[in-house]
Every structure is written in structure tokens, then in C-alpha cells.
């Protein structure tokens, strides 16, 4: 492709850029890092995205799948679908740190969010919560609220689902931190 053709191709596309104000929440904890990680894990179910897909395929209908998800979700109503231990990753660099990122969600909540906002809001699913030790050795639990991310859509249904997610995230963070 010649440079002029590339420019023409780019210009013929439409791009929308939307600003939003993120709300990043950090809870300080007196718990040791390992205890906060253990406590947050105790609140969540655990299944990979592959396992969730297999369960959906094997279910006779969405109702049957929903029953399985309610059982799997744990007390927090979240399923831990992936975990990234930044401490282990960075040990190879070597940068010493204690930090675990949990990728969490619930297909039933995702369905509500996607029904209300369409496929574009799927960009924000699943969500994340992190437990880490700061430079002073204090345990922190951090997450980004969903409500501010959904606010630019001006959709009351979307706002309601995002508010429920934010409440569940706050409860989960509180269980890990306190």
C-alpha cells in the first residue's frame, strides 16, 4: 500500500473518542498481604473463561446455566476467571513486589450490562481488583468503579447495573481489607 492510499483508508473511517472520569478506589488494610489475598479468594468462585464457555454449551438453556453460575459465584457474586501474580512476574526482572491482580466477573451480571448497553460495554468486562503491598509494606486493595465508565452512555438501565457492580466491588474490597 502506498502512503497516500493508507492515508485515504484512515480518513474514510469514523472515530469517536469519549472522555470519562475514572474513580479509582484504594482501601488500606492492616492485614498482611497474604491474608488479604486469601480472604478475597475465599469470597469468590473460581472458573476459567473456557470452563464458563463449556458450562454454557452444556446447559440445555440459559436458566440452567444461570443456576450453575449462582452456585459458582461465591459469596461475593463474583467469579475469579484469571489471576495475574505481578510479584512472580516481576521477580524475573528482578523487581521485588507483592501484587496480585484478580480478573473477576459474573456472566449473569455481564448479561444485564450487555443487554442495557450493547456490545460496546463488553470492553469493560470482566472487571479487575488488585491486592498489593505498597512501598511502606502496607497492604492495599484497589479497583476502578464501573459507574463512572458507564455514565457517558446516559442510560439509566446501564447506570443501575453499574451501581450494583460497584456495590459488589466495594463489598469484596472491604472483605479483603478488613
Placement of each model-derived feature along the sequence:
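Feature detects long, helix-prone N-terminal segments enriched in hydrophobes
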Residues: 2-178
Amino acid at each position: 500500500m502506498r502512503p497516500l492510499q493508507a492515508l485515504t483508508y484512515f480518513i474514510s473511517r469514523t472515530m469517536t473518542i469519549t472522555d470519562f472520569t475514572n474513580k479509582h478506589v484504594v482501601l488500606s488494610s492492616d492485614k498482611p498481604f497474604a491474608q488479604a489475598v486469601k480472604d478475597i479468594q475465599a469470597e469468590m468462585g473460581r472458573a476459567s473463561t473456557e470452563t464458563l464457555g463449556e458450562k454454557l454449551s452444556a446447559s440445555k438453556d440459559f436458566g440452567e446455566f444461570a443456576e450453575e453460575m449462582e452456585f459458582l459465584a461465591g459469596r461475593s457474586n463474583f467469579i475469579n476467571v484469571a489471576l495475574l501474580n505481578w510479584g512472580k512476574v516481576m521477580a524475573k526482572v528482578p523487581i521485588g513486589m507483592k501484587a496480585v491482580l484478580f480478573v473477576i466477573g459474573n456472566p449473569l451480571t455481564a448479561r444485564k450490562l450487555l443487554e442495557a448497553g450493547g456490545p460496546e460495554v463488553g470492553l469493560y468486562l470482566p472487571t479487575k481488583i488488585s491486592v498489593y503491598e505498597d512501598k511502606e509494606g502496607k497492604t492495599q486493595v484497589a479497583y476502578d468503579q464501573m459507574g463512572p465508565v458507564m455514565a457517558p452512555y446516559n442510560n439509566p438501565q446501564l447506570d443501575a447495573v453499574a451501581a450494583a457492580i460497584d456495590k459488589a466491588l466495594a463489598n469484596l474490597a472491604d472483605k479483603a481489607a478488613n
